[in-house]
Amino acid sequence: MIPPANHHDAPPPAAPRPKSGCLRGRLHWPEQRAIRTIIGFLGIALGAKVVHRVRYERGDHIPATGPAIIVANHLSSTETLAMARLVTGHHRFPHFLAKAEVFTWPLVGRVLRAARQIPVFRGSDRAADSLAAASREIERGHVVCLYPEGHFSSAPDLRPGPGKTGAARLALQHPGVPVIPVGMWGPRPGVKHIWHRHTVRLVVGDPVGLSGVPRTDEADVYRAATELIMSRITELAEQARGARFDAV
């Protein structure tokens, strides 16, 4: 049986952060949150425009309103900005799941917290908090973005690796919410790319249909749904790459 989504209304789990009280005592929480969200949105949108040339196909698969779960392959940290450009370019605001350590980086962490991005505490008893926070954003009608691999591709040809079950769990808890797969391709940033913008290509696919996943053992359901999601992402990544990956 698929466990029900967490309906408790609360902000995303708190990530490690430096102390700051520049807004405390002057504005009430709703006003603070609105200002911080605007700052975060502008920071992410500006970063996305500066770092990459983004080329995308079939972006109209991203729904204009209502919740959505966007899943993609994971090439590098900066490709998240390309994903943000795709989503904001279609007048939606993304809520990414990102490793908690990133929230401690100077400036970057402030922008992520301001934009209500979701920290992931890997290998800890707080790991489930991330999916609960993502579930709350979905219930608010927002767009949640995940990389099911959970880490950068380690394959020589950057083929997407096996996925973790978090995205499938989230999708099966919200059966009416579209799961939008995205395949990304671009050079992995390195020394030779550091001084100029590089092009990232994104191909957006039709929503992944999970209704046909056999409802047997719970763990098997999550694995089957994850494999289906990753197969669609891999197909789209090949389209973005313009060539098939090596057979495995």
Language model features: what each stretch is:
Residues 22, 64-124:
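Catalytic core of membrane glycerolipid acyltransferases/transacylases, capturing the structured
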Residues 26-53, 104-115, 194-196:
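Alpha-helical membrane-targeting segments
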Residues 36, 43-74:
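Helix-to-loop junction immediately C-terminal to a conserved catalytic motif
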Residues 52, 101, 124-128, 160-161:
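A conditional alpha-helix N-cap/helix-loop micro-motif detector
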Residues 52, 92-94, 115, 142, ...:
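A structural micro-motif
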